[in-house]
Amino acid sequence: MDLKDVQPYIEGKICMVTGGGGSIGSEIVRSLSKLNAEKIVIVDIYENGAYSVKCEVGDKVTVEIASVRDYEKMDCIMNKYRPDIVFHAAAHKHVPFMELNPEEAVKNNVKGTETVADLAEKYNTDNFVLISTDKAVEPISVMGASKRCCEMLSLIHISE
């Protein structure tokens, strides 16, 4: 895909990237910067990755250290920035760890998605983009099942 095709949808927009310091989220942040987003808000619970991306991308990026599971904190962040687009990339993604910690997969992936999607709706965000995984197709792992639930939650929000 040519990024120039996407630029009209991003240029001049306020974009939020949950998990913006992670492997996928940081690539989204870099792309948004190249596409001339007006402001990019990284929401991440881990400051190291978020700090690195901010240093790389520059002043266009603002970092908020928060968990997507914390509804009140996320509500404050959404109210503060009023993003046009939310890219929800925050997730536990390592299958073996989630098999050992299924409740954490559900709390972080499912509850986090529910929180971010609810708030995107509350603040009239133009677009909510869920970053999922191939493991959500006919899931055989806790992580895959949790991400499938995230997809279904996102579809429910679209249909409302």
Residue positions per predicted region:
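Conserved SAM-binding motif I beta-strand of class I
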Residues: 42-43
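Helix N-cap at the beta1-alpha1 junction of Rossmann-like dinucleotide-binding domains, i.e.
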Residues: 46-49
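A short, basic/flexible loop-to-alpha-helix module at the beginning of a structural domain
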Residues: 1-13
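Conserved Rossmann-fold cofactor-binding substructure of NAD(P)-dependent oxidoreductases
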Residues: 65-85
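N-terminal Rossmann NAD(P)H-binding glycine-rich loop of SDR-like oxidoreductase domains
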Residues: 18-33
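Conserved Rossmann-fold NAD(P)-dependent oxidoreductase catalytic core, especially the SDR/UDP-sugar
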Residues: 82, 88-148
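Conserved S-adenosyl-L-methionine
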Residues: 33-39
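Residue-level detector of conserved catalytic or cofactor/ligand-binding positions
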Residues: 156-160
